[in-house]
Regions:
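Sec/Tat signal peptide C-region and signal peptidase I cleavage site
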Residues: 7-14
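N-terminal module-boundary/linker segments of secreted carbohydrate-active enzymes
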Residues: 14-32
Length: 227
């Protein structure tokens, strides 16, 4: 994959990464994760130079709310959003009744995060998080997210090879970080898996649950114009 292309790491760096990764494995085992699952998830894992490159060159700028709307909520996205709202109306209404979040808000967040599931990122989440944790700039944060990602695999929600997301580790159609997955993901179709990658009932219910647990008030509008 082109996303994995980059300059090879020096031999000593690769060796140091392997030693560091063993430390992660030891920590995960100490937290009760299955050793066989960990061995499979961590086998052959290497840092991804492209992830470091993207982390280093994040743009530093701010947008006004109007600029944000023009960039993110364009006419095309609004049109598709209306189509998706109609297409999944019955499912969305059932979820809305349970979580007290109107269907249009679930679809709107879905569209903003991943263009209705179209752009979810093409990076292997565990390798990306390991790269960022090893890099050192935000090591504590990303190491924690890596351990949680491994726990998600250990719980059987998804296999490590299918756990894809953004370069920063945001996963699935609603772009949850692993810790957010643990806090908000829902197995709405009751199949034993919280599948925010490919199961729309789980995707929508997880979005609604996230909003509800974050203090969403269904009796209030999302915002008001201010002078």
């Amino acid at each position: 994959m082109s996303l994995l292309l980059g300059l090879p790491l020096p031999a000593h760096a690769a060796k140091d990464f392997g030693t560091w990764l063993q430390g992660v494995r030891t920590e995960a085992v100490g937290l009760g994760l299955d050793e066989e699952t960990l061995d499979k998830a961590l086998a052959g894992l290497k840092p991804i130079p492209r992830v470091i490159e993207l982390d280093r060159r994040q743009p530093e700028f701010t947008l006004t709310f109007k600029q944000y709307l023009q960039r993110v909520v364009n006419a095309r996205r609004v049109k598709i959003g209306k189509q998706k709202l109609a297409e999944h109306r019955q499912l969305l209404e059932r979820i809305a009744k349970k979580y007290k979040v109107q269907p249009r808000f679930m679809v709107a967040l879905w569209g903003i995060e991943t263009d209705f599931g179209r752009i979810t990122g093409g990076f292997p989440v565990i390798a990306s998080l390991a790269t960022l944790a090893y890099d050192g700039r935000r090591s504590k944060f990303f190491r924690k997210e890596l351990i949680v990602a491994l726990r998600i695999v250990d719980q059987g929600h998804i296999t490590s090879d299918k756990m894809m997301g953004s370069w920063a580790g945001a996963m699935g159609q609603n772009q949850f970080m692993p810790s957010s997955f643990q806090a908000y993901a829902v197995d709405y179709d009751d199949d034993g898996h919280k599948d925010i990658w490919g199961t729309l009932p789980d995707v929508f219910a997880s979005i609604a649950n996230y909003l509800t647990k974050s203090g969403w008030r269904d009796d209030q509008t999302w915002g008001r114009p201010a002078m």
